[in-house]
Amino acid sequence: MSSVSPIQIPSRLPLLLTHEGVLLPGSTMRTSVDSARNLQLVRSRLLKGTSLQSTILGVIPNTPDPASDAQDLPPLHRIGTAALAVQVVGSNWPKPHYTLLITGLCRFQIVQVLKEKPYPIAEVEQLDRLEEFPNTCKMREELGELSEQFYKYAVQLVEMLDMSVPAVAKLRRLLDSLPREALPDILTSIIRTSNKEKLQILDAVSLEERFKMTIPLLVRQIEGLKLLQKTRKPKQDDDKRVIAIRPIRRITHISGTLEDEDEDEDNDDIVMLEKKIRTSSMPEQAHKVCVKEIKRLKKMPQSMPEYALTRNYLELMVELPWNKSTTDRLDIRAARILLDNDHYAMEKLKKRVLEYLAVRQLKNNLKGPILCFVGPPGVGKTSVGRSVAKTLGREFHRIALGGVCDQSDIRGHRRTYVGSMPGRIINGLKTVGVNNPVFLLDEVDKLGKSLQGDPAAALLEVLDPEQNHNFTDHYLNVAFDLSQVLFIATANTTATIPAALLDRMEIIQVPGYTQEEKIEIAHRHLIPKQLEQHGLTPQQIQIPQVTTLDIITRYTREAGVRSLDRKLGAICRAVAVKVAEGQHKEAKLDRSDVTEREGCREHILEDEKPESISDTTDLALPPEMPILIDFHALKDILGPPMYEMEVSQRLSQPGVAIGLAWTPLGGEIMFVEASRMDGEGQLTLTGQLGDVMKESAHLAISWLRSNAKKYQLTNAFGSFDLLDNTDIHLHFPAGAVTKDGPSAGVTIVTCLASLFSGRLVRSDVAMTGEITLRGLVLPVGGIKDKVLAAHRAGLKQVIIPRRNEKDLEGIPGNVRQDLSFVTASCLDEVLNAAFDGGFTVKTRPGLLNSKL
């Protein structure tokens, strides 16, 4: 007797090619569709079809679809599964694709592929029919025994699970309600099997063969459950329910034939993770949190989104260096040598590092200081932080804070958010692997602020030695000790740093370099570095110190050495071109007449000194080594000089004075120009001035008007009222640059005094200081940078407030020798020093008055 399955499929089916899994009759699978042919199938057949027949597909397993429909169709698997598309979900991220929920109906065999584009369609033959066995009792008994044996193992497997779980109870009812012929396919799709084993079950057309192949799979799962029950400790009822819901996915098979290696490796990783938690040296609070999270992780299916989040959290917790630290090198003599070799000058900074080492020798549990290096760009603030770590023998990590405007970058995100991650502090500790590194917080003065919070406020806890031993990152949600971390912040100015944050840091000023210091730095560090980067040797290029001085004074004007480094790099590139061309010419000369070449070389070598690069421009022979970089070579390589000493030319008429200004880039000289014309007594100020500088200008003109008779200052009409029918225009050149601050007061007074007296201000004098309405000169900041700017500009005398005299101690000795300093407490002293011959009080012969 034979019977045919009631499921009838069309004789022609569109084919869905998949390699992610194997769909068996009676089971349901979710698959992603993103290849060209499969996308065409979904769009043309499923989304536009209106009949039930249009939703039936032929699913071909173990067959990847080519990415492009222009490629040939790969060899198709012989047996497939007719499936009903139950659900179609589309998405455009990260690329256009569909997710299909399909239910297997029956097996089929491909008879012939009818067409391949836009999607394959094949003529198929249905295979799932009830077979007619030979009419012998032996065969019937054999099939009956296989069926009973299969059913017995299936029931035994289900009864080992918790029947109170609805999913298990439903599976038990299915065993009693479904035909025995359908159970092998359904149970194979439920229990833990590999794709290869499912493919073998799919290819088993004979029902007897499917029974024989499925029974060993059931036995394996039963043995695995027994082993799990023996080795697993008693759990709470909730644990049993979770095991019962996903019983087969969690057991480890013992036959060794399972090829689902990803899940095995994942389970092994969880075991290793649990072992790391037990053996870690994290604090008790963190350990409790990890134990709680690992218990939750074991209960979760791997398909849950929270599974990956929890696992990432636990991996971070075991990787953090809770108690792992490096041993400090406390040899002060060796540290001094190392700092001197790495950096020239910076005596104040080196002194502070050596003091820290000395205190560490006396007290081992000293908390790390919070240092902040403040200075112009290019003076080596970042590199000196690396040298400090090298000196101490610690790990170094740099955190760039420029432009950071989200406090979560410091404190991390809470784990409730999608894509949450720890902050930069915790990430840095994970990277270095120790709990006492040197952290460089670069550009702390350029932190931003946004709706996501203020990162500067988040740094208050990090940079407070009294609080950072219990720093709590939002992602970790447990305290981490940062007290052993040596934090070094860098900034160009303290003006933009919040006061609360500034109060927590020890400020160390790193001023700009003098010309002599730049020359030493260039020949000790910059030139050797550039030679190495460009593949040159000292035997190929010679840069005298006088050439370096020319580069510093005529091609760069900065407090640091970055521009100097770039200019030296340009020189090395030009020399590299000459050297490479010379090698090419030598190769040509080797093939020419040797006698002629020797004669030419004797002619060229008449002068044995190193030749300049400009002398070798038109030679047919390779240049002689070393190539000398002189003034002419600089002009050929770098072009005409960018800066000239034009101070004396700009002070060739009255009404011009030189002031000194401080910027985040270092000190600068600043010209002040004044002119007068007939008018209505108005004061015009130009040059992008701030409110403070405008007030200084009004103060200056008021003081001069009140002392005009004393100094015999008159306007063009001979009146002591300087603004009577007279307009004054004050201009500060470099109008595109915003200027503000009180230190230009003395310069404005001197400029206006020169204008109304008709006398020239000395061209070699610069000045700085704040003024009052009574004519007092008040102290200002940035004296060292301002003095260095005057020295760079070639000036000879600097006028500063008397109360700033103490700041001259930080000026290098060679600069103090080149400059003379005048300390002034009032404007009378300033004017006397600014003009040749002084600016003494003038008196007119008094008129004889009589009462008669």
Swiss-Prot record:
One of its GO terms (biological process) is protein processing. Pfam families: AAA, Lon_C, Lon_lid, LON_substr_bdg. Residues 651-837 form the Lon proteolytic domain. The active site is at 743, 786. GO terms for cellular component: cytosol; membrane; nucleus; peroxisomal matrix; peroxisome. It is an enzyme of class 3 (hydrolase). Its EC number is 3.4.21.53. It comes from the Eukaryota. A motif (Microbody targeting signal) lies at residues 850-852. The modification N-acetylserine is found at residue 2. InterPro entries: AAA+_ATPase (IPR003593), ATPase_AAA_core (IPR003959), Lon_bac/euk-typ (IPR004815), Lon_lid (IPR054594), Lon_proteolytic (IPR008269), Lon_Prtase (IPR027065), Lon_prtase_N (IPR003111), Lon_prtase_N_sf (IPR046336). Residues 13-222 form the Lon N-terminal domain. GO terms for molecular function: ATP binding; ATP hydrolysis activity; ATP-dependent peptidase activity; enzyme binding; peptidase activity; protease binding; serine-type endopeptidase activity. It is found in: Peroxisome matrix. SUPFAM superfamilies: P-loop containing nucleoside triphosphate hydrolases, PUA domain-like, Ribosomal protein S5 domain 2-like. ATP binds at residues 375-382. It catalyses: Hydrolysis of proteins in presence of ATP. HAMAP family: lonp2_euk (MF_03121). Interacts with PEX5. Interacts with TYSND1. May interact with enzymes involved in beta-oxidation of fatty acids, including ACOX1/AOX. PANTHER family: ATP DEPENDENT LON PROTEASE FAMILY MEMBER. ATP-dependent serine protease that mediates the selective degradation of misfolded and unassembled polypeptides in the peroxisomal matrix. Necessary for type 2 peroxisome targeting signal (PTS2)-containing protein processing and facilitates peroxisome matrix protein import. May indirectly regulate peroxisomal fatty acid beta-oxidation through degradation of the self-processed forms of TYSND1. This is Lon protease homolog 2, peroxisomal.
